[in-house]
């Protein structure tokens, strides 16, 4: 089966990624996209929507394990928070984006004629209606499996797009579909792997800070060693007297790069 082969190949690539996990985050992110995600992407829009929920989760789980390797995140980290942290779309969203790009390419007659013959007919009456966003007549209902196959599913999805988007060339259309992806914060990749991993764990809410560890039921109290009621990120960075020297060194470094930063801090 296609899915089993994809998962087998992806897990092999994941093993390679695991062997070089000490590399910096930017490099690991790039390696994931070049080696592992390219395996998942192959024919993904064609078969993804006909998978069962359990089968879809197998693909999502592979990406989740890769995200933990890239960021150095701990076990039980939220999958959604990791995707937001990295600026990665879910496998489902990626399937839709890739499918729309392929469908638009076929619509623009930039593929072989044979595949164009699989397209539905253009709804000229609705196309001339200024209020209508539709361009193709939807396929007849032949059951959920047929409706989830490539052409019926992406015809329906493509018909929901605004007319000005449908008129774009393929390059501009891909620029549009890229806006459907989560925002990517490049400064999250800065620093060496260890320091970057520590900051990432705090951002995604799964660090060794007592507040975050307590929320998972791994310790009995969120109290800080200084006896503050919660060892939260805010308390850790700005208030706890146990880290006064480290905080002063951090603020001096900020002041060096950002003049008058101390005024903002106060």
Please describe what each predicted stretch is.
Residues 55-127, 235:
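Short, charged alpha-helical motifs in flexible N/C-terminal segments and linkers
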Residues 178-266:
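Family-specific functional microsites
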Residues 80, 85-89, 94-97, 101, ...:
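Amphipathic alpha-helical/coiled-coil segments positioned at domain termini
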Residues 1-46:
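Basic, alpha-helical interaction scaffolds
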Residues 22-34, 89-95, 141-145, 187-195, ...:
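Structural motif
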